[in-house]
Amino acid sequence: MIKVNVGDTIRSYDFKPMVGREDCFVEGVVERVTTEQGYKAYKITVTKDSWSDAEDKGRVGKIVFVPVEVSFMEYAGRVINLSRI
């Protein structure tokens, strides 16, 4: 498990990156670690959405809950702490 603190910026992949497929992820600032959605998650304010553009901001500015762990399709690097790179 990675080390994440409140105020850190993380990247969370929606799907495992693969050759030949565009990466799908959000980046955001960690507001807190919470269980308010029924699972342990990083509550983030999204600062970048890989699918957004000038016309459609996607999830930018929205609150997103990133699971700390998942039981299905978990892989190393699903969540990256960009503040510690």
Segments and roles (model prediction):
Residues I2-P17:
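Short coil-to-beta transition motif at edge beta-strands of beta-rich domains
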Residues G38-I44:
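Short aromatic-glycine-enriched beta-strand elements
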Residues D14, I44-V46:
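Residue-level recognition of conserved beta-strand positions in structured domain cores
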